[in-house]
Amino acid sequence: AAPCSCPGKPGRGDLWIFRGTCPGGYGYTSNCYKWPNICCYPH
């Protein structure tokens, strides 16, 4: 996944292309939606 950032969050997340939700099994705890992609934290 490509790196991305969410407003107000330190570090970087994983950008998932053309997804509306973060995939399970990666330990993501938060996300921000960037249509049509989603940024999932933490990386």
Swiss-Prot record:
Keywords per UniProt: Disulfide bond, Hypotensive agent, Ion channel impairing toxin, Nematocyst, Neurotoxin, Potassium channel impairing toxin, Secreted, Toxin, Voltage-gated potassium channel impairing toxin
Location relative to the cell: Secreted; Nematocyst
Protein's UniProt keywords contain Secreted: yes
GO cellular component: extracellular region; nematocyst
Main location: secreted
Stored Pfam families: Defensin_4
GO biological process entries: regulation of blood pressure
A GO MF label: potassium channel regulator activity
Disulfide bonds: C4-C39, C6-C32, C22-C40
SUPFAM superfamilies for the chain: Defensin-like (SSF57392)
InterPro entries assigned to the protein according to its UniProt record, in alphabetical order: BDS_K_chnl_tox, Myo_ane_neurotoxin_sf
Origin superkingdom: Eukaryota
UniProt similarity note: Belongs to the sea anemone type 3 (BDS) potassium channel toxin family.
Known function: Blocks Kv3 voltage-gated potassium channels. Reduces blood pressure.
Name of the protein: Kappa-actitoxin-Avd4p
Species assigned in the record: Anemonia viridis
